[in-house]
Amino acid sequence: MKVKAPGRINIIGEHTDYNDGYVLPFAVNRYVFLSIEGSDRFIFHSENVNETVEMEKIEKLNKWTDYISGVIASFEKRGYRVSPVKISVSSNLPMGAGLSSSAALEVATAYAISEYFSFNVPKLELVKIAREAEVEFVGVRCGIMDQFTSAFGKKDHAIFLDTMTLEYEYVPLRLEGYEINLVDSNVKHELSSSEYNKRRQECEEVLKTLGKKSFREVTKEDLERLSGTLRKRAQHVLEENERVLKSVQALKEGDFETLGKLLFSSHESLRDLYEVSCEETDFIVDYLRGKEGILGARMVGGGFGGGVIVLSKKGAFGKIKEELVESYKKHFGIDLTFHEIESSDGVQKI
């Protein structure tokens, strides 16, 4: 049996998903492909890494297999019996560019196991199983957005998701005359070892200081009670949530000019208040600002490298691509990679 699960790009709402905030992602037309069959032991094969790993029982190896093993462990924790299987994966999702290749692998695994063993697990439960694999097994304290989008994606739509209640709404993504590109800085970050978990701790510290249970209870007035780093982190989360709401409205009205401006201000906030951008992604965003037909850009993903999402009028980005490549190479000695991004449906059998 074969399945595919898409990666995702988040239009706006960065570092809000683990703070009970709003996000606006969509599933992209790049996938993890996975096949599953019975076996006498667990065999995991990755075409991309060109490696096969065998194990008698599920164990943590601190490598790519942990995403698969973690999902199986989550099923078993819930009382499902997963007998040994051979799982083969391949992907056309770029790693580390902010498109959530890990979540796509987890969702593909969860969906394949549920279907193969006829567990008939509801989609939302599969999302929770996939996320639990990353948080508890892999050890990255991610929010739920990535797995949710890979499972619930819908072509030609973004998902306006409230990560606190998991209520969601499909918002039409009509890009006629516009395009979305991803620029990969090719500066790689591994979330586990980066500042990501530190930002989570800082946000928990904010809540502790204010005596609140959730960021949804935090108001602009509360910022006065904070200072220094904690104030900056809280201000980003509050304002980024507002930007998501404005972006949903802009998308519904087909107002891409406003959406673009919101992307630029999101990047500034991620750079100055949340402090998760880096020299390379800042350079890309600054370079694009003010160029003809470029409506907006911001870093995407956890930060410290990765990708930049670019919203532009159709064809405008292509005209300045070469200059950007040369300029970036001159500054950093690194080549850029580009991906034109289209929306996609969520996880499915193939």
From Swiss-Prot:
Protein role: Catalyzes the transfer of the gamma-phosphate of ATP to D-galactose to form alpha-D-galactose-1-phosphate (Gal-1-P).
Protein location: Cytoplasm
Primary enzyme class: transferase
A Pfam family hit: GHMP_kinases_C
Site (Transition state stabilizer) residue list: R8
Catalytic residues in the record: D146 (proton acceptor)
Keyword Electron transport: no
Residues holding ATP: S46, G96, A97, G98, L99, S100, S101, S102
Keywords recorded for this protein, A-Z: ATP-binding, Carbohydrate metabolism, Cytoplasm, Galactose metabolism, Kinase, Magnesium, Metal-binding, Nucleotide-binding, Transferase
Lineage summary: Bacteria, Thermotogati, Thermotogota, Thermotogae, Thermotogales
Metabolic or biological pathway: Carbohydrate metabolism; galactose metabolism
InterPro entries the UniProt entry points to: Galactokinase, Galactokinase_bac, Galactokinase_CS, GalKase_N, GHMP_kinase_C_dom, GHMP_kinase_C_sf, GHMP_kinase_N_dom, GHMP_knse_ATP-bd_CS
Reactions that this protein is recorded to catalyse: alpha-D-galactose + ATP = alpha-D-galactose 1-phosphate + ADP + H(+)
Family of this protein: Belongs to the GHMP kinase family. GalK subfamily.
GO biological process: galactose metabolic process
Protein name: Galactokinase
Record-listed E.C. numbers: 2.7.1.6
HAMAP family xrefs: Galactokinase (MF_00246)
Annotated binding of substrate, by residue: E14, H15, T16, D17, Y196
Assigned GO CC terms: cytosol
